[in-house]
Design a protein with these regions (language model features):
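Short intrinsically disordered, low-complexity coil segments enriched in acidic
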Residues: 1-10, 79-80, 142, 160, ...
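N-terminal subdomain of lithium-sensitive/metallo-dependent phosphomonoesterases centered on the IMPase/IPPase/PAP
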Residues: 1-32, 87-89, 96-99, 129-132, ...
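Generic detector of well-ordered alpha-helical packing
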Residues: 11, 31-34, 65, 152, ...
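Short secondary-structure boundary/capping segments
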Residues: 17-20, 62, 105-108
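DPxDG-like acidic metal-binding loop motif
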Residues: 20-84, 88-96
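An extended, acidic
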Residues: 94-167
Length: 167
């Protein structure tokens, strides 16, 4: 389907900033976040889409195809997770219908330890130092290694406390 707004994507046509700075509203799309994870076939890749108005993101979608999980947030509405999504070919699906099928985040229950999530493919010495400092501060720290924007979803969902990124 066509959109009245331009689409900015690293896989798409390169547009000079002189052209892009005039865009009041645009889509930003990463159709394959976690390329290394996709190549490894470990399922830790996502499709990321954002709608930006006047340089402010107003809607974001992260889809995890292998898990059939859809994370989405809309300004003024909240953040949600919908499981079991195969496709949204029906153009008649409304935001309200999606919200009704979803769970509002954060979802996680209380726990007795701190959880950090880090990149599976880009674990830096700075991140390792930061996690060591977390262990000194919190004692019991669990480290979850994951790929793509799944790490951000885990924090949004409440399943992780922090995603340190220094690169």
């Amino acid at each position: 389907n066509e959109t009245p707004f331009p689409v900015l994507s690293e896989e798409g046509k390169h547009m000079d900033y002189a052209v892009r700075r005039g865009w009041d509203t645009l889509w930003i799309v990463d159709p394959l976040d976690g390329t290394k994870e996709f190549i490894k076939r470990n399922g830790e890749f996502t499709v990321n889409i954002a709608l930006v108005q006047n340089a402010v993101p107003v809607m974001g979608v992260i889809y995890v195809p292998v898990k059939k999980e859809l994370y989405f947030a809309v300004e003024g509405t909240g953040a949600y997770k919908c499981s079991g999504i195969v496709g949204l070919e029906d153009e008649g699906v409304t935001l309200q219908q999606m919200i009704e099928k979803s769970k509002r985040m954060p979802l996680a229950d209380a726990r007795d330890h701190f959880i950090a999530v880090a990149s599976r493919s880009h674990l830096t010495p700075e991140t390792e130092t930061y996690i060591a400092d977390l262990k000194k501060k919190h004692g019991n720290v669990e480290l979850i290694s994951s790929g793509s924007s799944i790490k951000i979803c885990l924090v949004a969902e409440g399943k992780a406390d922090v995603y340190p990124r220094f690169a």
